[in-house]
Structure formats: structure tokens, C-alpha cells
Amino acid sequence: MVIQWFPGHMAKATREVKEKLKLVDIVFELVDARCPLSSHNMYLDEVVKDKKKIIIFNKIDLCDRAETAKWKSYFENKGYTVVYTDAKNSNNLNKVIDKAKEELAEKIARQVAKGIKPRAIRSMIIGVPNVGKSTFINKLIKKNVANTANKPGVTKKQQWLKLNKDIELLDTPGILMPKFDNQEIGKKLSLIGSIKDDITPLDDVSLYLIELLKHNYLENLNNLYKINVTNEDENVFIMEKVAEKRFKKIGGDYDYDSTIKLLIQDFRTQKFGLITLDNYSDLLENEEHNEN
């Protein structure tokens, strides 16, 4: 089953982003710090390429900081300004505003030099579903003006919000790519809750999670389930070991349905510890392979 989700409201929101872009000075893109490349919407990136932009690595409290730091450098080397935030706990949010003012300082200075009183900075926030845009906005404004829920598709329309006297923000719904370059992106976005579970092949996603864990966080996997597997073991074998530890057999068979749900839920509730799904060395290997 191919993972794909681009409902009508996302297509409409994409058109509206294009239309409203001329009204804004700067774009904020929220990505999930656990998969900053996979949750970076390259399609929207192309749409907003002529605007100044800040990429916000949100949920920084949930990621493997050492691995995510490599992705921060990756984006900065491409010319982006990157800011870490933990919106849920209100950490580093004001730095985003400070960076926006820095990015637009020359434009504001030119207006002042001409005797023009600078208006409030107009910004737009974009991102795939469930990366924490609404929480980010509510914490920044210090009141609940955007709907929040730990599931995709909660914000369905655009709205202008006043963050403070210096900056206004156009909130937009979560928008996915019309199609994924590869299914690994879809699986990672499924794991962070950007795609609805009821349209996702959770068995494939859970096996993919095992694949990532056994190569990058094997100790976390073994410690959580009190198992002793290696990165050479088959993913289905590892799932059997987890099922054996956590669930009784049903009619002689392992309870795979419960095990699949357990694995995904344990990731989403940080039972494996601090995890970054996007592995920077994988990107380097792919680039080297493409060059050859």
C-alpha cells in the first residue's frame, strides 16, 4: 500500500499560500526536529523561494540532539536561518521573532531613512500537519487562538493573528507534498502523526521503525523490551521477539496487531528515548551513490 495523503483542503491551502505570499515579508516553516528533512516540504519551499525564510526545528526536546545538529548545519549550509524551539514548553520562541527582525533589518532601515514609519512585519507560518504550528502560535501569543490536537488536519483555514505590535502572522493549515519522493518520507511522517493512521499501512510503518531502530538505536530497542537482538536480525524476527515479551499468543500465533500498535505508540510517547528518524549519514551515502 502506497502512503499518500493530499486531501482537497490541502490543495486549496496551497493555492491560498501562493495568493497570500505577496502580502508577507517573511515565511516561518516549522519542521519536526526528529525528521527535519522528511518534514521539510520541498514543494512549498519552491513556492516561497523568493521570500526570506526561517526554518524552525520544533519539538527539539524529543530528538537526538547530536543527530539533529547535523541537519541544522545542513540547512544553514544551504543558506537557511535555523532556530530550535520547544513550543510545548515555550522554549526559545522569542528567538524566532528576534531572527525575523534581523532578517528584515535592512528593509526596515531603508524605510526609516526615507521617513516612512515601518509597519508591523507580516509573516506566514507553514509546515506539514502535526509539527506543532498551533501550539507554537498559542504559546507565542500567550493565549489560545489556534486549535490544537496531537493529530493531523486540525487547522483547516488561514487566519491573520497579531503576535505583538511588531509582527503579524498568517496561520495556514498543515500541507503535505502532493506526492512523496520516496515512501520512507511517508513512513516517517506517519510515525510523527502527520498522516492519519486509518489511511496508513501501520504494519509497514512499524517494520520500518524497527529497521531504523536496529541500525541507529539498537540499545534503546533492546533495553525497552528486554530483548537481545542485533542489527543483522530480520525485522519480522525482532517484531516476534517484542510480541513474545509483551503479549500472549493467540491460538498459537503472535499478537502482531497489538505489537504493531505498541511499537508506534512507544515511539510517539518517547519510550525509546530521544530519537531522530532522519539519519544524516544516509543522506551522504545516497549522494555518494548518485555521484557514482
What function would you assign to each model-found segment?
Residues 1-26, 34-42, 47-52, 66, ...:
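Helix-rich effector regions associated with P-loop NTPase G domains
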Residues 31-34, 60, 75, 140, ...:
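Anionic group-transfer/hydrolysis microenvironments
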Residues 61-126, 145:
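Canonical P-loop GTPase G-domain recognition
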